[in-house]
Design a protein with these regions (language model features):
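Trp/Phe/Arg-rich N-terminal binding region typifying the photolyase-homology
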Residues: 1-206, 388-389, 434, 438, ...
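Alpha-helical packing segments of well-folded alpha/beta enzyme cores
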Residues: 25, 78, 82, 100, ...
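Active-site-proximal binding-pocket segments
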Residues: 287-478, 484
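Glycine/tryptophan-enriched, flexible segments
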Residues: 146, 170-357, 465-466, 470-563
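Soluble or luminal CAZymes and related metallo-dependent hydrolases
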Residues: 74, 78, 257, 378, ...
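Charge-dense, low-complexity intrinsically disordered segments
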Residues: 65-69, 73, 252-255, 259, ...
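Generic recognition of cysteine residues
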Residues: 27, 67, 89, 122, ...
């Protein structure tokens, strides 16, 4: 480049906010860029293949990868969709693979900035690994003599953590249990109206990204879109996600991206009125429509929780219906908020083996037991079916997650972090705070539950939520001919009964890898094993009314700002 260019550079660094609609960070970047006649808005997404993506990027404790190929593919799709949406606005998206600190530094240097500083705007991150990346960016740019300001903008929750009115010191003062938090927030706080897409009108976009890059002679290839191989995934990983399992509970033809996220919300709430029955069907396990399936798009920011909550409120208003179902969807978004705020308050304690309650306990790390759990070969059909579904599709129902967590931590006595890391690798909807705190809750080491141990009655759960074994047979086809009365406990069948249904225990289907006698004892008169002591809550109850907070809640108790 010959000579420095005079302009204001404002980089929007997309992270877990892969959308235009209701994106506070993007709105902030547009405002900064629009404040100067020579302002440039430069959108970029960086695949960090040194810390997140690739077959060889592993978790700290286990051999689980930080991001499995299925979620990586979903994010690739989301980034491609984001680029298309930006291009429709006259903009574009630069996509790079590498360390964010290196790439952001190179961009600033190639553009030869003469303005006072570069604005780098991104959505706020709260956990240590993500914050470390922020620090790496700041350190590297400073070492290169680049003047910059890194803006981290909150935008992934229903409520802004900086304006939690009932709590004097914001997230640092929130209760360590959910119910009092929920009551205060619903009483005193309002959900902000979702923001419009800030660049849905070309006149609001300061510059066309491609034209500016061409004018200043920047050598960035802004049409580049990496493949899984480019991100460091091996052939086996790539082949494993090349097809969609027909048994998948995800909506047919689902893809990553804001376009598909908005389509799913429209389908679930408006086109099919599935929202009407959500409260009653949310604990099912077969099919695409028993639950919203919004979570994968929420996790990578293809849609905002405020948008979903607003659609629920609009549904109540336009259809004249206020029900447990519409409320419960917003309630679960509030739980998601709480986990994020809780993680902000307690920091790295959400990753400690002793949990946020700092309860020391000897955890096993038996690799054979852990692998049997991962492979869905434990001998307990409910556990095996759920684990096989996760491996094949990247999805598992909420009911399934609770049971497999309880089984790993409380029956196998394996370090709960092994499970959390495996979920981090496999889940399409992996969210740091939600994943790790749900695992802490299940292992009984979380302040959220007061350290209470809720041991799930695996067999009873199986009989309650999959009475006829439809889900079990779907994912454990070797049990296809086992009768309904034995499908939940195949190890209790006699040899003659096994011969009759063509199944040999230990050969066609594994024998139980551990004796959870108390579970069997309370579910069958022909059980074996000595009962174990449990609290009054044996797995958070098993009826559809297992959430006592509903008793005291007015329907539609969430509030929106009218601005």
């Amino acid at each position: 480049m010959d000579g420095a260019q005079s302009f204001s550079l404002n980089i929007h660094w997309f992270r877990n906010d892969l959308r235009l609609l209701d994106n506070p960070a993007l709105c902030n970047t547009v405002q900064l860029s629009s404040a100067h006649d020579d302002g440039i808005l430069l959108p970029i997404f960086i695949f960090d293949n040194s810390r997140v993506y690739g077959s060889n990027v592993k978790s700290k404790l286990s051999s689980s990868r930080k991001c499995g190929p299925r979620r990586a593919q979903f994010i690739l799709e989301a980034v491609a969709d984001l680029r298309q949406n930006l291009e429709r606005c006259g903009s574009g998206l630069i996509v790079k693979v590498g360390k964010p600190e290196t790439i952001l530094g190179e961009i600033a240097q190639q553009m030869d900035i003469t303005s006072s500083y570069v604005n780098i705007v991104c959505q706020e991150e709260i956990c240590s690994e993500e914050l470390f990346i922020n620090e790496a960016v700041s350190s590297h740019l400073t070492s290169q003599g680049i003047k910059f300001k890194l803006h981290s903008i909150s935008g992934s929750t229903l409520y802004d953590p900086n304006t939690l009115l009932p709590f004097d010191r914001g997230v640092d003062n929130i209760p360590d249990t959910f119910s009092p938090f929920r009551k205060e927030v619903e009483k005193h706080c309002k959900i902000a109206v979702p923001l419009d897409a800030p660049i849905n009108d070309q006149s609001k976009l300061p510059h066309n990204t491609r034209n500016i890059l061409k004018e200043i002679g920047c050598s960035l290839d802004d049409d580049y879109m990496p493949t899984l191989a480019d991100l460091g995934y091996n052939t086996e990983d790539i082949e494993s996600v090349s097809t969609v399992d027909p048994r998948s509970a995800m909506p047919k033809g689902y893809r990553g991206g804001e376009t598909f996220a908005l389509s799913r919300v429209k389908e679930y709430i408006w086109d099919k009125d599935l929202i009407q029955t959500y409260f009653d069907t949310r604990n099912d396990m077969v099919g695409a429509n028993y639950s919203t399936k919004f979570a994968p798009w929420l996790a990578c920011g293809c849609i905002s929780p405020r948008y979903i909550a607003r659609e629920c409120a609009r549904y109540e208003e336009l259809r004249g219906v206020k029900s447990k179902s519409t409320y419960w969807i917003v309630f679960e978004l509030l739980v998601r908020d709480y986990f994020r705020f809780f993680a902000m308050k307690h920091g790295d304690a959400i990753f400690f083996p002793s949990g946020t309650i700092r309860k020391k306990r000897h955890w096993d790390t038996n690799p054979i037991l852990c692998q049997a759990w991962k492979d869905g070969m434990t001998g307990y059909p409910l556990i095996d079916a759920n684990m096989r579904e996760l491996a094949a599709t990247g999805f598992m129902s909420n009911r399934g997650r609770q049971n497999v967590c309880s089984f790993l931590a409380l029956e196998l006595n394996l370090d709960w972090r092994l499970g959390a890391e495996y979920f981090e690798e496999m889940l399409l909807d992996y969210d740091v705070s939600s994943n790790w705190l749900n695992w802490q809750n299940g292992a009984g080491v979380s302040l959220c539950t007061g350290g209470r141990i809720n041991r799930f009655n695996i067999v009873k759960q199986s009989k309650t939520y999959d009475k006829c074994g439809e889900f079990l047979r779907l994912w454990c086809p070797e049990l296809q001919n086992v009768p309904d009365e034995s499908i939940h406990t195949p190890w209790l069948m006699s040899e003659a009964e096994m011969n009759e249904c063509g199944m040999v225990l230990g050969q066609d289907y594994p024998s139980p890898i551990v004796d959870i006698g108390a579970v069997v004892e309370s579910s069958s008169s022909s059980s074996r094993g000595r009962p174990k002591k449990e609290g009054k809550n044996k797995g958070r109850a098993t009826s559809s009314n297992d959430l006592p907070t509903m008793k005291s809640l007015p329907i539609g108790s969430y509030q929106f700002d009218q601005k």
